[in-house]
């Protein structure tokens, strides 16, 4: 398709060996470091080049496993899952087959987030870590999503932290485009999209931080 017409940088023969060597050096250095919880072998495989990402995904998993790290490995399953448990494409099926746990991305509102999470836990008997979430514009909020993850005993990462040069406090262009195409779409552009703290290190919303602290404390008691 047109969106996959360009080359990924690892598809250039002069670049790929450098990339693989870098990956090997990093894993060798930290493979027994207890500060590393897990290895995300590839972020959102297939997003850039579709099924052409599968050979690289297999190579990277083989390389990292050959180095015998103490930590588990995963690649993101981020298109979601059908309610019958079927993964949506060959890239996701490959990522799941190679992974030790499910690395799940979702910026969906509560109902869709819960449906996907329930389906993963029902059909795939592996730990789940939500490695990307929080999109207030799309009603994926700390108030609704964080307590749900705690109750379901699902780990999570909030990749953004302080308002900065990534500008992810602002909605992605794709959200603006959807809103322009459909004025009735249910986005709230009055809110920050992402990040938890302002440049002055005060919380964007102190209530969010209190929720995170409160539910972390409850989780510690389990």
Predicted regions and their residues:
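Active-site mouth of glycoside hydrolases
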Residues: 1-99, 105, 123, 133, ...
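Alpha-helical scaffold elements lining the catalytic groove of polysaccharide deacetylases
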Residues: 15, 19, 111-113, 118
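Active-site beta-to-alpha loop of glycosyltransferases that engages the nucleotide-sugar donor
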Residues: 108
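Short low-complexity, flexible loop/linker segments enriched in glycine and/or proline
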Residues: 89-90, 143-146, 171-175
């Amino acid at each position: 398709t047109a969106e996959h017409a360009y080359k990924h940088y690892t598809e250039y023969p002069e670049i790929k060996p450098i990339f693989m060597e870098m990956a090997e050096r990093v894993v060798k250095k930290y493979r027994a470091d207890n500060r590393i919880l897990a290895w995300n072998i590839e972020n959102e495989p297939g997003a850039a080049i579709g099924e052409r990402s599968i050979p690289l995904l297999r190579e990277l998993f083989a390389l990292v496993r050959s180095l015998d790290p103490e930590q588990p490995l995963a690649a993101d399953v981020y298109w979601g899952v059908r309610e019958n448990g079927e993964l949506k494409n060959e890239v996701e099926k490959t990522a799941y087959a190679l992974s030790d746990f499910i690395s799940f991305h979702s910026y969906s509102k509560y109902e869709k987030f819960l449906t996907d999470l329930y389906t993963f836990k029902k059909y795939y008997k592996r730990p789940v870590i939500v490695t990307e979430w929080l999109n207030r514009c799309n009603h994926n909020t700390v108030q609704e999503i964080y307590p749900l993850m705690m109750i379901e005993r699902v780990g999570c990462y909030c990749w953004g932290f302080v308002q900065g040069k990534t500008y992810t406090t602002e909605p992605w262009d794709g959200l603006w485009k959807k809103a322009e195409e459909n004025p009735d779409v249910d986005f709230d552009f009055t809110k920050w999209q992402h990040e938890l703290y302002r440049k002055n290190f005060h919380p964007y919303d102190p209530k969010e931080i209190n929720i995170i602290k409160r539910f972390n404390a409850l989780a510690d008691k389990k």
